[in-house]
Amino acid sequence: MAKKVFKRLEKLFSKIQNDKVYGVEHGVEVVKSLASAKFDETVEVALRLGVDPRHADQMVRGAVVLLHGTGKKVRVAVFAKDIKQDEAKNAGADVVGGDDLAEEIKNGRIDFDMVIATPDMMAVVGKVGRILGPKGLMPNPKTGTVTMDIAKAVTNAKSGQVNFRVDKKGNVHAPIGKASFPEEKIKENMLELVKTINRLKPSSAKGKYIRNAALSLTMSPSVNLDAQELMDIK
């Protein structure tokens, strides 16, 4: 098994040049050619930003609804009450509740990919914050997941909303589609993501904003992208 994996990786690495920087269009083309798994691999972009997340004013966090979705069926949980529960259900939410949902989560129920809540339910959500937080599921106003417009939030989540947040080392990782997507759709999704991240550049960030960029599949080596080209996307 290990020998087969090594041969597969060796073949993939032979298709790229480690020290080469690719333009967006060529990079997408190369990454698609690396698809070799028996499942539809996820295309992921990784950006190294010139920010220091230790400073609150340099924390880059937000959300973007990809033009062509992520290719993944997203299950959405909503914390709401009264008429807002009905709005959530009508919009297609998979799980809707209040204190009862919090109790289910405490008992181990995590069968959803995104959590949305109305502002008045955040006290209830806070009771399971230690469970949701480490899994990246805690609702936040910056990602549009704490809102009174529940229908819109659920629709966005189902349509391919991607939430992103810079990590401690200044990196942002985000899925932008599947290997089966046409090149143009992958490219357009990536440009929409990068455009959003560029808009969120902190005024206190110094020097080059996007320092490095790479594109990869779930089971492939990464391809280096032209960071300057990405910074020029408005």
Swiss-Prot record:
Source species of the chain: Helicobacter pylori (strain J99 / ATCC 700824)
Biological process GO terms, please?
regulation of translation; translation
Query: What is known about what this protein does?
Result: Binds directly to 23S rRNA. The L1 stalk is quite mobile in the ribosome, and is involved in E site tRNA release. Protein L1 is also a translational repressor protein, it controls the translation of the L11 operon by binding to its mRNA.
The family database entries (PANTHER family) matched by this protein are listed as: 54S RIBOSOMAL PROTEIN L1, MITOCHONDRIAL, LARGE RIBOSOMAL SUBUNIT PROTEIN UL1M
Per UniProt, subunit arrangement is: Part of the 50S ribosomal subunit.
Q: Which Pfam families match?
A: Ribosomal_L1
Entry keywords, A to Z: Repressor, Ribonucleoprotein, Ribosomal protein, RNA-binding, rRNA-binding, Translation regulation, tRNA-binding
Might you report a single GO cellular component term?
Answer: cytosolic large ribosomal subunit
Q: Which InterPro entries match?
A: Ribosom_uL1_bac-type (IPR005878), Ribosomal_uL1 (IPR002143), Ribosomal_uL1-like (IPR023674), Ribosomal_uL1/biogenesis (IPR028364), Ribosomal_uL1_3-a/b-sand (IPR016095), Ribosomal_uL1_CS (IPR023673)
On the tree of life, the source organism's domain of life is Bacteria
Protein name (Swiss-Prot/TrEMBL): Large ribosomal subunit protein uL1
Q: Which family does it belong to?
A: Belongs to the universal ribosomal protein uL1 family.
Q: What is the lineage of its organism?
A: Bacteria, Pseudomonadati, Campylobacterota, Epsilonproteobacteria, Campylobacterales
